[in-house]
UniProtKB/Swiss-Prot annotation:
It is found in: Plastid, Chloroplast. This is Maturase K. Usually encoded in the trnK tRNA gene intron. Probably assists in splicing its own and other chloroplast group II introns. Pfam families: Intron_maturas2 (PF01348), MatK_N (PF01824). It comes from Pinus coulteri (Coulter pine). The gene is matK.
Length: 515
């Protein structure tokens, strides 16, 4: 990999590298064999594992020949036999070949992505999903409209192969990829007869396809937006759900009402800002309504002519930030005016001026979260706590741990909102639901449970916010916590409740356009 990278920097050798001979390297299949055993051992029971899972390189070469000959007796994606032990040897070799194919294709892709980032010094990828909010804090208040787009999932296999040819000139190395893609497209489980590229599929091959597909879309889109806009540069950042990360925030970022914010992205005359979390890109635009309509039209045409995809209208929707709330990952987002009183003393006279600035105001969706808690049987539809009957068979420690995990995730994820009063209502619902669950388990009352357990009942589950401030900040900083928003660098994914609410919001948008 280092040799490929060195050659790629010097003479763009990575565009012309011959990858097909790598398919016949025994070391490559030894790596894929070990990786497959590691993954399968974590998902299969111990009685299904065997010490005879040895890799035969001759069998691998026969399977490669079958792929080249379009022999569909090899099945890489479907196991039609319900017996997990039947035909396991065949599945073992198929997975090894698929793993090796992914490893070979990852070589030029990783070089290309690193080379483009180091050469352009523009793309920024962060591990924590909270990294999206400092970007919004810094860029979105200066915009007046946003385009909420979604990356299409379904794509034809030949389009993927054609885009691979842009940076892989070794045509024989693409024949196995084409065969594998068409085999998946024609498999009985694939009812849509297309390649569904999603970031949530937990396989190395589909994660690679997703990373490649997103990078291909963004690299072309950025260059087109730069040419079409009058700004000298385009600010953009890509966030979680990717397997390759070039930069990482290592510390917690605190934004205060009173302190001026230091710019993270230093740009000259920016007018278009692009941010993506998962499969949802957001483009913020500062300009007239006609410019917003042109950008929306351009995105639809771009997908239609470059990827041969017909995008539904709801997949690219526009609205003004000053009038509407946008649903970002788990938050309601709006831009509000923040008046600041400034006193300037010159000699004996005192001048008072009012400055009005715009700032992003993340709002916790309390009512939808309570509705989701009611769906999960923690409370009724009005928010009244009830016992979690399905957990009464667990031990007391397990019950406390589960409520503790729910509250800790909610509190950490929504710590970036100034108004956290609604979170304490959710805390009340969870704490009383925990007490009722324990009371139902022991066939007693809440008063008896509190008397028996005493302060230990909620000491473990519902004091995490105090521990958080005491461990990470001084007492003075903890006193200012009500006027500060805190973004964390250790949140790799959206909170499950927030993710469920986000899906409901997306369905509402789809139904609105269907009517």
């Amino acid at each position: 990999m280092d040799e490929f990278h060195r050659c790629g920097k010097e003479d763009s050798f990575w565009q012309q590298c011959f990858l097909y001979p790598l398919f016949f390297q025994e070391d490559l299949y030894a790596i894929s064999h070990d990786h497959y055993l590691d993954v399968s051992s974590s998902s299969r029971p111990m009685e299904h594992l065997s010490s005879n899972d040895q890799l035969s390189f001759l069998t691998v070469k026969r399977l490669i020949g079958q792929i080249r000959q379009q022999n569909h007796s090899i099945v890489l994606f479907v196991n039609c036999d319900p017996n997990p032990l039947a035909d396991r040897k065949k599945s073992f070799y198929s997975e090894s070949v698929l793993e090796a194919l992914t490893l070979v294709l990852e070589v030029p892709f990783s070089i290309w992505s690193k080379y483009s980032v180091e050469g352009m010094n523009e793309s920024k990828s962060f591990r924590s999903i909270h990294s999206i909010f400092p970007f919004l804090e810094d860029k979105f208040p200066h915009s007046n409209s946003i385009l909420d787009a979604r990356i299409p999932y379904s794509i034809h296999p030949e389009i993927l192969v054609r885009t691979f040819r842009r940076w892989i000139r070794d045509a024989p190395s693409l024949h196995p990829l084409r065969s594998v893609l068409y085999e998946y497209r024609n498999s009985p489980d694939n009812l849509q007869r297309s390649i569904i590229v999603v970031p949530r599929v937990n396989t190395r091959f589909f994660l690679f396809l997703w990373n490649y597909y997103v990078c291909e879309c963004e690299s072309i889109l950025f260059s087109r937006l730069k040419r079409s806009s009058h700004s000298r540069s385009l600010s953009h950042g890509s966030f979680p759900q990717r397997t390759h990360f070039h930069r990482k925030i290592k510390h917690i970022i605190i934004f205060s009402r009173r302190n001026s914010l230091k710019s993270i992205w230093s740009l000259k005359d920016p007018k278009i800002h692009y941010v993506r979390y998962g499969e949802r890109p957001i483009i913020a635009i500062k300009g007239a309504h006609l410019l917003v309509k042109k950008c929306r039209y351009y995105l639809l045409i771009f997908r239609q002519f470059y990827f041969h995809l017909w995008s539904e209208p709801y997949r690219v929707c526009s609205h003004q930030l000053s009038k509407n709330c946008s649903s970002s990952p788990g938050y309601f987002l709006r831009v509000r005016m923040n008046p600041i009183l400034v006193r300037t003393k010159m000699l004996d006279e005192l001048f008072i001026a009012d400055l009005i600035t715009d700032e992003i105001d993340p709002i916790v969706p309390i009512v939808p979260i309570i509705g989701l808690l009611a769906t999960e049987k923690f409370c009724d539809i009005s928010g009244r706590p009830i016992s979690k009957l399905s957990w009464t068979s667990l031990t007391d420690d397990d019950i406390l741990d589960r409520f503790d995990q729910i509250w800790r995730n909610l509190f950490h994820y929504y710590s970036g909102s100034f108004d956290r009063d609604g979170l304490y209502r959710i805390k009340y619902i969870l704490s009383l639901s925990c007490a009722k669950t324990l009371a139902c388990k022991h066939k007693s009352t809440i008063r008896v449970v509190r008397k028996e357990l005493g302060p230990e009942l909620f000491k473990k589950s519902f004091s995490k916010e105090r521990e958080f401030y005491s461990l990470r900040f001084s007492s003075k900083a903890a006193a200012r916590s009500q006027r500060e928003r805190i973004w964390h660098s250790d949140i790799p994914q959206i909170n499950p409740l927030a993710n469920s609410w986000q899906k409901i919001q997306d369905l509402k948008i789809e139904n609105l356009f269907d009517q």
